[in-house]
Amino acid sequence: RTALQSGIDKLADAVGLTLGPRGRNVVLDEFGSPKVVNEGVTIARAIELPDPMENAGAALIREVASKTNDSAGDGTTTASVLAREIIKLGLLSVTSGANPVSIKRGIDKTVQGLIEELEKKARPVKGRDDIKAVASISAGNDELIGTMIADAIDKVGPDGVLSIESSSSFETTVEVEEGMEIDRGYISPQFVTNPEKLICEFENARVLVTDQKITAIKDIIPLLEKTTQLRAPLLIIAEDVTGEALATLVVNKMRGILNVAAIKAPGFGERRKALLQDIAILTGAEFQASDLGLLVENTSVEQLGIARKVTITKDSTTLIADAASKDELQARIAQLKRELAETDSVYDSEKLAERIAKLSGGVAVIKVGAATETELEDRKLRIEDAKNATFAAIEEGIVPGGGAALVHLSTVVPAINGEDKDADERLGADILQKALVAPASLIAQNAGIEGEVVVEKVKAREWEIGYNAMTDKYENLVEAGVIDPAKVTRCALQN
């Protein structure tokens, strides 16, 4: 047990150093150049202890950090510090003869009660300032990142997706990509309309959406004739266009008779159908599905969609369309949100979130720039944290930061467990009550102040008041912009 405990301590100490505005950075000496990191889960994942028992202890904290990171994407340091305290106090009690199962039950009951309390106390995010505050705190008090994330969310809305990429310059910028991007480019480079940029651009194009292969030109001749009469370009999205059909399209395109381009359907298997359906709804097309017996040769112009602007490069296609029916689009987004709520797989939930964003018309790309590779890594991690924290806050509201929410929750513990008769369960509740003040105490210690004094002072104040380590004052943290997403605090507790 001692070895387990010492492993837990070693890891939690390294992670705990980064907590709070005055937290230090940790330098990880991995292969290649050392990395400077200020982010719990990365540190936890990087540390392996030589002693197998100690490493088993460290693995417990690593697990806690990873779980919190998966569910809330931030708050990993807080969760690790909590876990360490609970384990430390728990081992003490068990050593002195308490029943570990009852203690665990006591802790679980209390956590349940505290989470209900947290939900009551959390207040929804109001406007841009809150978003900026949450993002800044999470990125390690970086106002710049806070402003950026607030900008990005202004542009794409709460359903949008923020993706984070490395930029080749020193600047960090936010770009908003309108419309829906498909990761498939033109089937043949002959379709290019702008030879300088090697892209194909259409305006007000008709769109054919199908999951069939098009090989015979006679299947699409009626459509080609109609769209040529309408003087509208035609974009074909099909499983593949090959053989005679492709050859004919290319020849006629080069002679300037037809204005047409073809791309392969994105995704594969079940996901391909779903994505094609999304495109169809966005452009107002009828999805010509082979399993419904809708053949391409019978397609009429009315069944084609319309895209206001189409840009096709060699490996991606962007469609900007004004959805024909807003209701259908909203219904589709709602359906995807339900699926997102029900799925367990991380891969699926990422893909679903991406589809929701593409349909609701917003993908903001934050291009992260920095002077060195090391700085870039650190900045990307911080922005990633800030992004996750912001979406968590939009989802479940905010609570005062700086560990204050947990300190205030610790004062509610006796009320939750008033009627518990079992001594060991009560012990569990006490352990949790003592552990809850650890994050606030550590934030103060990292700022060079006596932790216990801070905790006692915070306990005596109202819910929103806490210790601000940046200004070294006790103040209303919500007004001072020191706020955490309730979801992050909740996940830290649960794990």
From Swiss-Prot:
Q: What is its main location?
A: plastid
Q: What PROSITE patterns does UniProt report for this protein, alphabetically?
A: CHAPERONINS_CPN60
For the keyword ATP-binding, the answer is yes
Does the UniProt entry include the keyword Iron? no
CDD domains in UniProt? GroEL
SUPFAM superfamilies with a match to the protein in the record: GroEL apical domain-like, GroEL equatorial domain-like, GroEL-intermediate domain like
Keyword terms:
ATP-binding, Chaperone, Chloroplast, Nucleotide-binding, Plastid
One Gene Ontology biological process: protein refolding
Any one GO MF annotation of this record: ATP binding
- State any GO CC term: chloroplast
> What Gene3D superfamilies has UniProt attached to this entry?
GroEL, GroEL-like equatorial domain, TCP-1-like chaperonin intermediate domain
Where does it reside?
A: Plastid, Chloroplast
PANTHER family the UniProt entry points to: 60 KDA HEAT SHOCK PROTEIN, MITOCHONDRIAL (PTHR45633)
Q: How does it assemble?
A: Oligomer of probably six alpha and six beta subunits.
Other remarks on this protein: This protein shows ATPase activity.
What does this gene product do? This protein binds RuBisCO small and large subunits and is implicated in the assembly of the enzyme oligomer.
* Family membership: Belongs to the chaperonin (HSP60) family.
Q: What is this protein called?
A: RuBisCO large subunit-binding protein subunit alpha
Name the species this protein comes from.
Ricinus communis
